[in-house]
A protein has these predicted regions:
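Small-residue-enriched core segments of transmembrane alpha-helices in multipass membrane transport
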Residues: 7, 33-44
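Conserved E/DxxT/N motif and adjacent residues on the DHp alpha2 helix
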Residues: 67, 74, 187
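ABC-type nucleotide-binding domain
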Residues: 77-78, 82-299
């Protein structure tokens, strides 16, 4: 609209000025000065229009953000919740059931198993069987509708959520990276982590080599959701973050499913280091991913 109005205004001024010059009411120099001034005003007016559009977009985004922030959490600490104390890292699912809605068909029903400290438990089965749902119940992303889940004998619904999630690391198929530097993305694994600790975690995750090859190294910005990195690079940064967090319980949700063969081999080597000494629940479709598991559960 501003472009059209501006064009009409300039055209009208030129036409009027030409008519007045022809009638001897204005000098040509006056017309040139006036038109030049008008043209110089076009860009600032356009900038104001652009600024208004950006402001409106920002206000709409703020409204969505505030709506999200004001949404009450469905899963909160229960009265009297205590901090989780992990001594060994044994995980027990006892007759666990879950449905996404009250009247919905149960996604899980009567699931019971024990993952002893340091064991790797593989969860396999067709898509939609509830494998990802099963591991998402452990950090209480969802709340089990029946049964109990315990860590070292402590029911997770009776412990503080922050302490529970500090004890669990998750590496999923889609790595969550922020539009920040590589060092900052790895550092999210542990508050106040030193640069040296971040670099050690990256080396353990087989990420240091490709990071050092980047122009800015650990200070390279990864872009929104890590879109400046390949899938394998994103996964190794996510693994480095889990290495840095050093939680006793590890959840792997198809962490290598979307990778090519070369990237998968690099990531799998890093995952084997990450699993060492940790109680691990693995969701996978490839048999190569679960061949070293202590127990394979079919859903």
């Amino acid at each position: 609209i501003l472009e059209v109005v501006g064009g009409i205004a300039v055209g009208g001024v030129v036409a009027l000025a030409s008519w007045r010059v022809a009638n001897g009411d204005m000098q040509v120099g006056d017309v040139i000065a006036f038109v030049t001034t008008l043209i110089l005003m076009v860009q600032p007016v356009r900038a104001i229009g652009t600024l208004n559009a950006i402001t409106q977009e920002g206000l709409a985004a703020c409204e969505r953000i505030l709506t999200l922030l004001d949404t009450p959490r469905k899963i909160i600490d229960r009265p009297g919740a205590t901090a989780l104390v992990v001594k060994q890292g044994q995980v027990d699912y006892n007759n666990v059931g879950f449905a996404y809605a009250k009247d919905a068909i149960a996604a899980l029903d009567g699931i019971s198993f024990t993952a002893r400290a340091g064991q790797t438990i593989a969860l396999v089965g067709p898509s939609g069987a509830g494998k990802s749902t099963l591991i998402n119940l452990l950090p209480r992303f969802f709340e089990a509708t029946s049964g109990t889940i315990s860590i070292d004998g402590q029911p997770i619904d009776g412990v503080n959520i922050n302490s529970l999630r500090k004890a669990v690391s998750l590496v999923s198929q889609e790595s969550v990276l922020f539009d920040d530097t590589i060092a900052a993305n790895i550092g999210f694994g542990r508050d106040g982590a030193s640069r040296a600790a971040i670099e050690v975690a990256a080396r353990d995750a087989a990420a240091d080599e490709f990071i050092q090859a980047l122009p800015d190294g650990y200070d390279t910005y990864v872009g929104a959701m890590g879109n400046r990195l390949s899938g394998g690079q994103r996964q190794r940064i996510a693994i480095a973050r889990a290495m840095l967090k050093d939680a006793p319980i590890l959840l792997l949700d198809e962490a290598t499913a979307a990778l090519d063969a070369k990237s998968e081999q690099q990531v799998r080597s890093a995952l084997q280091k990450l699993q060492a000494g940790r109680t691990t629940l693995v969701v996978a479709h490839h048999l190569t991913t679960v061949r070293n598991a202590d127990l394979i559960l079919v859903l």
